[in-house]
Structure formats: structure tokens, C-alpha cells
């Protein structure tokens, strides 16, 4: 329900298919229902009952960590506000936010380096070298993921330039209701990455005006439908690797809950469009 909450929603926002205010107004309730219903059902099931004991933290915590966390989150939220006030492209606001975070990180890191050097807690070879947090963060950028999305978007753009995407969109509108197509698109995002699906849909319906209900429904479907399979979202893939969650365990324990949440949220959106908006 936020223009920066999912990469596909950000694509629609940057493509001027949806606006911030209308996106929040139309999707916050369906998104809330999509979250609450499966969470409530899961709370009644035995595997999800009990207390969770967090493992003890290892290593010394940085006292400036909370400051950087809150600063980063605040500046991310600032991006839609910046676009609304200045009417500049969203990437300008994001780069401005990044530069502020990098500047503050460098200032804090330089001060901590100076203090520890004075106190004599560093070795001689370490005193002559200051590790930049900005350079350290840049070295962790996942270039394969960036190139993956670049390849996907270029492929869709090539198909769009040939007119194939537009032709397919016309055939879809003549064959099935567009709302049903959007629901199937959300389900398909659990198998196929949602980025190419949304990029293709933006080329299928070029005549739809900004803030048309279809664009908002696509934002909801693509953003939540991928959770039905663990491989359908970037967060699921990361969790599968970090927590060793198997594909079939997720499908058996979580997949049906995600399906219920997805369908109830979609139903809430369609009912709201029918009777309230």
C-alpha cells in the first residue's frame, strides 16, 4: 500500500500509473486484511503457539546503530514526500537520502576512529587506515541481482517495442474480465518474478489513466501474490537460505495461509470499488 513498499509498486509509481495518496487510500485496507486474516488463523494453530526465545547477541553493539537505523528509515519515507513537493523523479529523492546517510555515517565513523586512536586501543597498522562505511556498503551491492532486473526490463521493453505486449493485452481484455486477469497475474507472480509481470502489464494497458483502479489492483496483486510460494518473493528466497526453510514445508504450512490472505484482500478491494469508491 506504499509506493516504496515493494519494487513492483515502485515501478508503477515511477511510471506515473499510481499516485502516493490514492495508492494509500485504496490499498491500505485490503493490505491490512491480507495480513490480519492469515495471522489470526495462524495464531490458532499449534505450530505457531508458544514463546520465542531470541538467541543472545554476539559482539559489541554500536551505540550509534539506532541513530543510523531511524535516520535511514525516515529518509526512505521522505522520498515520496520529496517527489510530491518538488515533482522531481523519485531517484533524485532516493539519491539525496543516500547521500545524507553516507555523510552521517562518515562523520560518526571518523569521530569514533579519532577517539579510539587517542585512547590507544588500535594497533599501529590500524591507526594509519580508516575503513570507510560508505565504501564497505558499496562493496556489498549485489550486482547479479541488478543485472537480472536490467535484463528482465530490457526483454519486456523489446517485446513491447514489437507490439507483442500490447496485442496480448488487447486479447486479454476481449477474452476474460480484467479483474480476473489481475488475480491470475498475482498468482503467477508466485512462480514467475513479479517484476516482468508488472512491466508487461504496464505495456498491455497504455490507455488506462493514472490512478485507474486496475493499476492499484495490479499493485496489490503483484505485491502480495508472490508470498504463496517461498520462491515467489525476494524475502522468501532470503529466508529459505538463512533459516534453511524447505520449499515443501513452506507450501504445506504457510502457502495456504498466504492464499487465504491474498484472496480475502483481493475480495475486499473489489467490494470497496463496487460499493464505496
Per-region residue spans from a language model:
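C-terminal ends of transmembrane alpha-helices
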Residues: 2-9, 77-83
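Transmembrane helical segments that form the transport core of multi-pass membrane transport proteins
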Residues: 75, 79, 83-213
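Loop-to-transmembrane-helix entry motif
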Residues: 141, 221, 254-258
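Juxtamembrane and boundary regions of transmembrane helices in multi-pass small-molecule transporters
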Residues: 1-2, 11-13, 18-68, 72, ...
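Membrane-interfacial helix-loop connectors
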Residues: 1, 7, 11-28, 157-248
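Hydrophobic core segments of alpha-helical transmembrane domains in multi-pass membrane transport
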Residues: 31-43, 69-81, 97-106, 149-157, ...
Amino acid at each position: 500500500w506504499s509506493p516504496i513498499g515493494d519494487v513492483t509498486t515502485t515501478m508503477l509509481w515511477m511510471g506515473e500509473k499510481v499516485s502516493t495518496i490514492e495508492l494509500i487510500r485504496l490499498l491500505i485496507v485490503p493490505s491490512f486484511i491480507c495480513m490480519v486474516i492469515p495471522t489470526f488463523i495462524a495464531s490458532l494453530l499449534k505450530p505457531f503457539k508458544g514463546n520465542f526465545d531470541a538467541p543472545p547477541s554476539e559482539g559489541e553493539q554500536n551505540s550509534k546503530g539506532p541513530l543510523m537505523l531511524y535516520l535511514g528509515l525516515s529518509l526512505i519515507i521522505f522520498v515520496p514526500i520529496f517527489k510530491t513537493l518538488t515533482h522531481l523523479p523519485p531517484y533524485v529523492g532516493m539519491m539525496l537520502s543516500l547521500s545524507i546517510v553516507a555523510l552521517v555515517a562518515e562523520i560518526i565513523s571518523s569521530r569514533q576512529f579519532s577517539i579510539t586512536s587517542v585512547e590507544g586501543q588500535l594497533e599501529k597498522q590500524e591507526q594509519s587506515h580508516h575503513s570507510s562505511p560508505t565504501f564497505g556498503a558499496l562493496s556489498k551491492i549485489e550486482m547479479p541481482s541488478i543485472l537480472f532486473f536490467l535484463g528482465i526490463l530490457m526483454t519486456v521493453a523489446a517485446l513491447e517495442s514489437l507490439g507483442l505486449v500490447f496485442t496480448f493485452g488487447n486479447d486479454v481484455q476481449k477474452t476474460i474480465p480484467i479483474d480476473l486477469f489481475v488475480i491470475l497475474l498475482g498468482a503467477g507472480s508466485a512462480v514467475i518474478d513479479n517484476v516482468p509481470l508488472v512491466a508487461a502489464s504496464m505495456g498491455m494497458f497504455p490507455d488506462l489513466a493514472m490512478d485507474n483502479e486496475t493499476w492499484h489492483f495490479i499493485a496489490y496483486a503483484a505485491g502480495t501474490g508472490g508470498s504463496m510460494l517461498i520462491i515467489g518473493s525476494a524475502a522468501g528466497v532470503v529466508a529459505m537460505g538463512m533459516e534453511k526453510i524447505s520449499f515443501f514445508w513452506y507450501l504445506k504450512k504457510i502457502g495456504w495461509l498466504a492464499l487465504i490472505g491474498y484472496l480475502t484482500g483481493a475480495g475486499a478491494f473489489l467490494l470497496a470499488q463496487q460499493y464505496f469508491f
